């Protein structure tokens, strides 16, 4: 392989200047597919000579400075390209002109148009349309600013990719060590790293000394991984001789040659993949779009029909255009945009109190319609701390307490064997508590040391008191640290116990290796020879604990005889001058990262809510399956193919996969699957665990679920999860353990890292969907009594019953608080017991909702308004039949002798005062019938009497709208400002019977729905 090969396939192909858009798009898709493939490299297989040939690097002196400068010029700096961010002004414009706002803008423009037409054609005209246009524009701008502020506040996007690049790196060039900027590291550089450093680029290790790296941000595995020059695995992500860019070196030192830099590193590929993925449209955005189509359709249909009708009725063109505009504007629910924004914001605030931080307001609802959750294991389902789970000593398994608050079972701590075991676990252990934590509970203390050793340290500290004092009593003389060839750790301590020899040798390590070094075993404090029977007992215990997905360690000791090893003996760990065989076996201790306490309950809730929970983890299949069973992702009694094969004692290949409800898929099998095979697994198995998966596979799993039509939520904390988080319908990152990159890709952040918070989120999301429906039903209903006066005015030629300004007073005044108050309504029934909604069929606004709001309740409201209108005119001398066809004379300011039914003559001024009084009364009637509408909108199925009136905001809303209506009617000066006049108290009561009718009508309808579920009434009217 020549230099530079293997790099070329990531270089962007040259696109000709006039290369069309399609070419670019296809290329982008090709690049994305390339990134989704597994990491392929062969540097880990090359010998040192081949490496030297491939990169032209002297393995002791490094590159020359000149050569390094050439490569830097060719490849560019070793940095990740930051993801493309949307400029703030674009985000702001989206809020101002997106979706619903567009409808209001069109309304405002039409108003200005109508005002312009009137101003040009008549000397004397009113300014209603001008006011209306200004108010509409103001509504859009104010709600736009509000949504923008809300989103900007919750998504202060972290500059996370910048923080990931280590600032300095130690390279060897021209045979000299020099510290340079990490951005200047080039392919072929010889780099040195030590404990505490971040790895500056992808390295092929050529020499190492006790080096361990923490790959958790990349693979999700919490255990530090050993790094050495040995080629140990075909898979570059698993082999020991490659260290990855931006992972941390925890201990030891290593030297390596840089094989990839910047965007070409494994981490860089993941980052590019995440920033290149398109997140789709959120379900609620799609719903609102669908709703706008409906409303616009209705408005335009009515407008055009009446435009044609008014021409047939011999109105002039100009009048007809004014009518058209009037009808379209009356149809637009001006207050709805604000209502939806406020409802989503309230829910986002409520979720923040429950530890869910929502970055994108629309994501609030998406979580409610989720049908599949792909959850990471470590830290989300589990506590993300290794904990001692079981011990095996005195030939039986003892259970330790793994609960977060130590409320579980404990075991017999009096046995002499346990004392010996705890002594080894405390002494043969390099973990220490960090300083100044004496006041913290033991489990909460920070530990310096690897995960398994800290688990042992905390366990012994809890059971046996201070480990520090134990270590002071038994001073350490020498130790052999754990290494991958012997697989044990050993130390020798001074022993001050009078009845024991002066030196104590303790050892721990891989159980089978430890057992091989033992010839006796301690049972109930007495040493016995290790026979076959006891070896079998050990083997069974080891298999049982391993089968629980636990990490098992074996412990043994030896009391060194004083005659051979007197006081002051010089122990030598290089030329070993003390026994490491024929030791005495004490017992096993097994550890696991235990499930969080609230998770099994949360998984159960998901199941009853019809949500499928899939575990996707980088961990071992056995551990993954054990945790899945522990939290209920694989429920009791459900078997995998392997379980069935074991039970029937037949080979796995003979089991029909469809007989197994549960399924554990290994990453290496997933690699060779076609998308059809993956679809089959997702379709036919209800309980699925994917283990040993790579970041790219997470993404493939998410896409597979989406092909099934599922709305997918993904949880994750590592950088490795960011592509899947971005692709999912809703990405959920972890607030505590999460890397910045994953937080940036996500839509929502769990502040307490707890899976149970997701379930709370689902509940809130479902509730907001229900409540938005109610809010919209309430808001839309008053559209009918707002439009019909205009239509009757055109058809029957009567004085206008309701003016434009009064319509605005309803939409932006009296209806606002009640509509928002419905967002505080509690759930009617257990919303977590029903299936997730199907986004294709179960819409936010459907035909049934429109038919209820417009066709039924709205019509009753309109009747109430007209009744009041006719009563007032009749009291003033104009009987209903006398009004037909009177409009032309009525609106003519030069006619001052219009006669009423009793022959009285009315001047223009007097007529207009009566007309505006009618407007005010019609407005008040709408408020009165909206009382009933608000109360019936509280529930969709239950009776209002079942639901109760616990919603204080709603009760306030009722009083607020009434007070506002009274204020507008009786406040002095309103006659000039809004042309609203005081009403006789009796006129308030005209609409009461209609209000009562609405309430009774709807209660009967809901009663029928409850009595006959699935019947005709439910099919036609349940929205």
From Swiss-Prot:
Q: Which residues carry this modification: Phosphotyrosine?
A: 10, 260, 542
- Active-site positions, per UniProt? 376 (4-aspartylphosphate intermediate)
Residues of the region (Phosphoinositide-3 kinase binding) are 82-84
Q: How does it sit in the membrane?
A: Multi-pass membrane protein
An example of a Gene Ontology cellular component annotation for this protein is: melanosome
- CDD domains documented for this protein: P-type_ATPase_Na-K_like (cd02608)
Q: What tissue specificity does the UniProt entry give?
A: Expressed in endocardial endothelial cells.
PTM annotation (N6-succinyllysine): residues = 661
Q: Can you give the propeptide residue ranges?
A: 1-5
Could you state what the record's PTM comment says about this protein?
Answer: Phosphorylation on Tyr-10 modulates pumping activity. Phosphorylation of Ser-943 by PKA modulates the response of ATP1A1 to PKC. Dephosphorylation by protein phosphatase 2A (PP2A) following increases in intracellular sodium, leading to increase catalytic activity.
Q: Where is this region: Mediates interaction with SCN7A?
A: 596-717
The PTM Phosphoserine maps to 16, 40, 47, 228, 452, 484, 668, 675, 943
Instruction: Give the residue ranges for region: Disordered.
Output: 1-38, 216-235
Disulfide bond annotation, renumbered to this chain: none
Q: What is its EC number?
A: 7.2.2.13
- Please verify whether the record's keywords include Hydrolase: no
InterPro entries reported in the protein's UniProt record: ATPase_P-typ_cation-transptr_C, ATPase_P-typ_cation-transptr_N, ATPase_P-typ_cyto_dom_N, ATPase_P-typ_P_site, ATPase_P-typ_TM_dom_sf, ATPase_P-typ_transduc_dom_A_sf, Cation_transp_ATPase_P-type, HAD-like_sf
Provide this UniProt record's keywords sorted from A to Z: Acetylation, ATP-binding, Cell membrane, Cell projection, Ion transport, Magnesium, Membrane, Metal-binding, Nucleotide-binding, Phosphoprotein, Potassium, Potassium transport, Sodium, Sodium transport, Sodium/potassium transport, Translocase, Transmembrane, Transmembrane helix, Transport
GO biological-process terms attached to the record: intracellular potassium ion homeostasis; intracellular sodium ion homeostasis; potassium ion import across plasma membrane; proton transmembrane transport; regulation of sodium ion transport; sodium ion export across plasma membrane
Q: What class of enzyme is it?
A: translocase
Catalysed reactions, semicolon-separated: K(+)(out) + Na(+)(in) + ATP + H2O = K(+)(in) + Na(+)(out) + ADP + phosphate + H(+)
Assembly description: The sodium/potassium-transporting ATPase is composed of a catalytic alpha subunit, an auxiliary non-catalytic beta subunit and an additional regulatory subunit. Interacts with regulatory subunit FXYD1. Interacts with regulatory subunit FXYD3. Interacts with SIK1. Interacts with SLC35G1 and STIM1. Interacts with CLN3; this interaction regulates the sodium/potassium-transporting ATPase complex localization at the plasma membrane.
Protein function? This is the catalytic component of the active enzyme, which catalyzes the hydrolysis of ATP coupled with the exchange of sodium and potassium ions across the plasma membrane. This action creates the electrochemical gradient of sodium and potassium ions, providing the energy for active transport of various nutrients. Could also be part of an osmosensory signaling pathway that senses body-fluid sodium levels and controls salt intake behavior as well as voluntary water intake to regulate sodium homeostasis.
* PANTHER family attached to this UniProt entry: SODIUM/POTASSIUM-TRANSPORTING ATPASE SUBUNIT ALPHA, SODIUM_POTASSIUM-TRANSPORTING ATPASE SUBUNIT ALPHA-1
- By what name is this protein known? Sodium/potassium-transporting ATPase subunit alpha-1
User: Which organism does this sequence originate in?
Assistant: Oryctolagus cuniculus
Supply the source organism's classification: Eukaryota, Metazoa, Chordata, Craniata, Vertebrata
Name of the gene encoding the protein in the UniProt record = ATP1A1
């Amino acid at each position: 392989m020549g230099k530079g090969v293997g790099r070329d396939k990531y270089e962007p192909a040259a696109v000709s200047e006039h290369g069309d858009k399609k070419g670019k798009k296809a290329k982008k898709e090709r690049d994305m597919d390339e990134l989704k493939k597994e990491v392929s490299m062969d540097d880990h297989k090359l010998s040192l000579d081949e490496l030297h040939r491939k990169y032209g690097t002297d393995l002791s002196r490094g590159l020359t400075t000149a050569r390094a400068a050439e490569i830097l010029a060719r490849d560019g700096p070793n940095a990740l390209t930051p993801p493309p961010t949307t400029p703030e002004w674009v985000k702001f414009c989206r809020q101002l002109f997106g979706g619903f706002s567009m409808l209001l803008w069109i309304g405002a423009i039409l108003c200005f148009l109508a005002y312009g037409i009137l101003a040009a054609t008549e000397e004397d005209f009113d300014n209603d349309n001008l006011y209306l246009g200004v108010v509409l524009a103001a509504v859009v701008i104010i709600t736009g600013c509000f949504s923008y502020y809300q989103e900007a506040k919750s998504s202060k996007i972290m500059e996370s990719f910048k923080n990931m690049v280590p600032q300095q790196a130690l390279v060897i060039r021209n045979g000299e060590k020099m510290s340079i900027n990490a951005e200047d590291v080039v392919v072929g550089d010889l780099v040195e790293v030590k404990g505490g450093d971040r790895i500056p680029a992808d390295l092929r290790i050529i020499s190492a000394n006790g080096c361990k790296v923490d790959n958790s941000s990349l693979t999700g595995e919490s255990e530090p991984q050993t790094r050495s020059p040995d080629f140990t695995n075909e898979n570059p992500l698993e082999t020991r001789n490659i260290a990855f860019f931006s992972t941390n070196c925890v201990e030891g030192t290593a030297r390596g040659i840089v094989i990839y830099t910047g965007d070409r590193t494994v981490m860089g590929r993941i980052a590019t993949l995440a920033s290149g993925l398109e997140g789709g449209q959120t379900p609620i955005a799609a719903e609102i779009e669908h709703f706008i189509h409906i409303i616009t359709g209705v408005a335009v249909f009515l407008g055009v029909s009446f435009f044609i009708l008014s021409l047939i009725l011999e109105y002039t063109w100009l009048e007809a255009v004014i009518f058209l505009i009037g009808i379209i504007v009356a149809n637009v629910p001006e207050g709805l945009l604000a209502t939806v924004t406020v409802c989503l914001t309230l829910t986002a605030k409520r979720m923040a109190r429950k530890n869910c931080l929502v970055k994108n307001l629309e994501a609030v609802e998406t979580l409610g319609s989720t049908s599949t959750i792909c959850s990471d294991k470590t830290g989300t389902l589990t506590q993300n701390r290794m904990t001692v789970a079981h011990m095996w000593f005195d030939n039986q398994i003892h259970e330790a307490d793994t609960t977060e608050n130590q409320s579980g079972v404990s075991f017999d701590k009096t046995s002499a064997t346990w004392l010996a075991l705890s002594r080894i676990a405390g002494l043969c252990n390099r973990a220490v508590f960090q300083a100044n934590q004496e006041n913290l509970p033991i489990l909460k203390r920070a530990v310096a040391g690897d995960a398994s050793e800290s688990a042992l340290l905390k366990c012994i500290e809890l059971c046996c008191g201070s480990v520090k004092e134990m270590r002071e009593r038994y001073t350490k003389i020498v130790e052999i640290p754990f290494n991958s060839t012997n697989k044990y750790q050993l130390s020798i301590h001074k022993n001050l116990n009078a009845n024991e020899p002066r030196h104590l040798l303790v050892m721990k390590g891989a159980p089978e290796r430890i057992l091989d070094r033992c010839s006796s075993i301690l049972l109930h404090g007495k040493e016995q020879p290790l026979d076959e029977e006891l070896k079998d007992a050990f083997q069974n215990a080891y298999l049982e604990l391993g089968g629980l997905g636990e990490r098992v360690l074996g412990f043994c000791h030896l009391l060194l005889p004083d005659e051979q090893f007197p006081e002051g003996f010089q122990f030598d760990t290089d030329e070993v001058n003390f026994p490491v065989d024929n030791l005495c076996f004490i017992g096993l201790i097994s550890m696991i990262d235990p499930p969080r306490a609230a998770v099994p309950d949360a998984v159960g809730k998901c199941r009853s809510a019809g949500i499928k929970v899939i575990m996707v983890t980088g961990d071992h299949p056995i551990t993954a399956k054990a945790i899945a069973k522990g939290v209920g992702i694989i429920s009791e009694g459900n078997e995998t193919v392997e379980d069935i094969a074991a039970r029937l004692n037949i080979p796995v290949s003979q089991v029909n996969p469809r007989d197994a409800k549960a399924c554990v898929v290994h990453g290496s099998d997933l690699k060779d699957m076609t998308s059809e095979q993956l679809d089959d697994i997702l379709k036919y198995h209800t309980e699925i665990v994917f283990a040993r998966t790579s970041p790219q596979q997470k993404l493939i799993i998410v896409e597979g679920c989406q092909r099934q039509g599922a709305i997918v939520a993904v949880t994750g904390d590592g950088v490795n999860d960011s592509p899947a988080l971005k692709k999912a319908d809703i990405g959920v990152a972890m607030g505590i353990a999460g890397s910045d990159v994953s937080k940036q890709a996500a839509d929502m952040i769990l502040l307490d890292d707890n899976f149970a918070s997701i379930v709370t989120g689902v509940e809130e999301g479902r509730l907001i969907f229900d409540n938005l429906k109610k809010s919209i039903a309430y808001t839309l209903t008053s559209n009918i009594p707002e439009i019909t006066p205009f239509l009757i005015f055109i058809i029957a030629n009567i004085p206008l019953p309701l003016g434009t300004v009064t319509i605005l007073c309803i939409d932006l005044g009296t209806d606002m608080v009640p509509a928002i108050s419905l967002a505080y309504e509690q759930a009617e029934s257990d919303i977590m017991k029903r299936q997730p909604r199907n986004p294709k069929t179960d819409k936010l606004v459907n035909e049934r909702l429109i038919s209820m709001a417009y066709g039924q309740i709205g019509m009753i409201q309109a009747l109430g308004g007209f009744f009041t209108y006719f009563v007032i005119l009749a009291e003033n001398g104009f009987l209903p039949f006398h009004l037909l066809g009177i409009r032309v004379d009525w609106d003519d300011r030069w006619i001052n002798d219009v006669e009423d039914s009793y022959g009285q003559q009315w001047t223009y001024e007097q007529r207009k005062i009566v007309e505006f009084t009618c407007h005010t009364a019609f407005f008040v009637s709408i408020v009165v019938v909206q009382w009933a509408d608000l109360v019936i909108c509280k529930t969709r199925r239950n009776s209002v009497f079942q639901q109760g009136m616990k919603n204080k905001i709603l009760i306030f809303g009722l009083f607020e709208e009434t007070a506002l209506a009274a204020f507008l009617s009786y406040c002095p000066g309103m006659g000039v400002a809004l042309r609203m006049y005081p009403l006789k108290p009796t006129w308030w009561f005209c609409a009461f019977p209609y209000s009562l009718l609405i309430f009774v009508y709807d209660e009967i309808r809901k009663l029928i729905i409850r009595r006959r579920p699935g019947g005709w009434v439910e099919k036609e009217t349940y929205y």
